């Protein structure tokens, strides 16, 4: 049943491209990004790393597609396959690239950075200031999510998408938290 994820990925790319082209001013440059990886344990040069094979098995895959333009903001889509069936995961854009530990990806990328670390204030840790891609897998272990924010990246950029253990909390003191960091995919936002 590998054709369904491939068709879903193609549909997401086409949808993102049509969104950016239909509303973007002709003089507004559109930035596209795409990343794909098959999760493995960490090794030097790995771009898709699993830290918890019980929740993100080796061989699971992730695809990230994104468009960004001043006229439309930033839209990011995530498609995953091979994860646990019927499971809720959190996922976010993170400030750093993947590394040997999930912590190496750094904090969530925030358009307006929270001066307090770690950031758990819903004023900063929210789906308008961060890229949140929470999803629930189907009975095949396939999931997808889309985020649209009204800002674009400047000189500071996110460098990865991290899959977390649970959906993202929104309450004060816990905003932006989503449990353990399970896996990481390098993305050149």
Protein language model features and the residues they cover:
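N-terminal leader/targeting pre-sequences
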Residues: 2-88, 93-189
């Amino acid at each position: 049943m590998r054709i369904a994820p491939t068709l879903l990925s193609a549909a997401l790319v086409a949808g993102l491209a049509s969104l950016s082209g239909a509303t973007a001013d002709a003089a507004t440059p559109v930035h596209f990004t795409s990343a794909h990886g098959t999760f493995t344990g960490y090794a030097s040069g790995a771009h898709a790393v699993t830290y918890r094979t019980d929740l993100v098995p080796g061989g699971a895959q992730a695809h990230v597609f994104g468009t960004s333009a001043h006229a439309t903001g930033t839209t990011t889509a995530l498609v995953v396959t091979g994860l646990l069936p019927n499971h809720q995961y959190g996922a976010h854009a993170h400030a750093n690239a993947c590394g040997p530990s999930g912590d190496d990806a750094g904090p969530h990328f925030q358009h307006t950075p929270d001066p307090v670390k770690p950031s758990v204030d819903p004023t900063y840790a929210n789906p308008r200031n961060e890229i949140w891609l929470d999803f629930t897998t189907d009975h095949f272990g396939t999931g997808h999510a889309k985020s649209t924010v009204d800002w674009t990246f400047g000189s500071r950029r996110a460098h990865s998408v991290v899959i977390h253990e649970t959906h993202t909390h929104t309450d004060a003191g816990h905003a932006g938290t989503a449990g353990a960091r399970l896996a990481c995919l390098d993305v050149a936002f």
